[in-house]
UniProtKB/Swiss-Prot annotation:
It comes from Rhodopirellula baltica (strain DSM 10527 / NCIMB 13988 / SH1). This is Large ribosomal subunit protein uL2. The gene is rplB. One of the primary rRNA binding proteins. Required for association of the 30S and 50S subunits to form the 70S ribosome, for tRNA binding and peptide bond formation. It has been suggested to have peptidyltransferase activity; this is somewhat controversial. Makes several contacts with the 16S rRNA in the 70S ribosome. One of its GO terms (molecular function) is structural constituent of ribosome. Keywords: Ribonucleoprotein, Ribosomal protein, RNA-binding, rRNA-binding.
Amino acid sequence: MGIRIYKPTSAGRRNASVSDFKELTPGYTPERSLLRPKTKTGGRNNQGKITSRHRGGGHKQKYRVIDFRRVKDGVVATVDSVQYDPNRTARIALLKYPDGEKHYVIAPSGVAAGDKLQNGPDAPPVVGNCLPLKNIPLGTSVCCIEMRAGRGAVMCRSAGTQATLQAREADWAQLLLPSGEVRRVPSACRATIGQVGNSDHMNIVLGKAGRSRWLGRRPHVRGTAMNPIDHPHGGGEGRTKGGRHPVSPSGKSAKGGRTRQKRKPSNSSIVRRRKSRRYGQLKLHK
């Protein structure tokens, strides 16, 4: 993909940029059988309480049903088109199987209309194919990785992400993730060969607040600008937060505090934690 930079014809256009969408298939239409209605929540739960701040509004969207499991083995599918998905940063590819079945999958970089893709242990390790980690050569870049066999891909699904298969031992495979974390996953788990497309997404500049609102993002108000009833940093005369370390509205440490569960089952699968810009190499949970 490429990025198109706008001319500074107004304050909102200055420094703004947008994808050129050249990787998309011209003239495609979304597959209606794979579309579902998407209800907006505004960041509220079933009690009407805000559980995710700064959410609300945005353009109306329809959800695209993505095949994250890719268990239709032994059949060669044809990429009908590469399409835009408003629900994620990556592009999606529409696969057509010989029996007429159609599936959406995350489109790796380099996949285009007309390509042939396969799933299963007998598939060749080429970009776009999905196969178990035990059948993938060491050093290969992979994406859309399962953490439990048959549960579907959960890691490396956003634009431009990829992991590297570093080693295999017994029934486990060792992966270097984009964050720098090294993690073990069962070698029976599946992954897609290649890097997720739309890698320049991180370089796009929205340019104005309105484009954030189109995406359903509401303003992020500072705690020091609030009243004491609304935030621990609120109130006071002038710009002061009462001598307190930065915290969230609920009082949790906002800069570097651990929020991960200490006894989370997947902690045992982490070989090396990521490197933090602030604290350097992080230690494993004990």
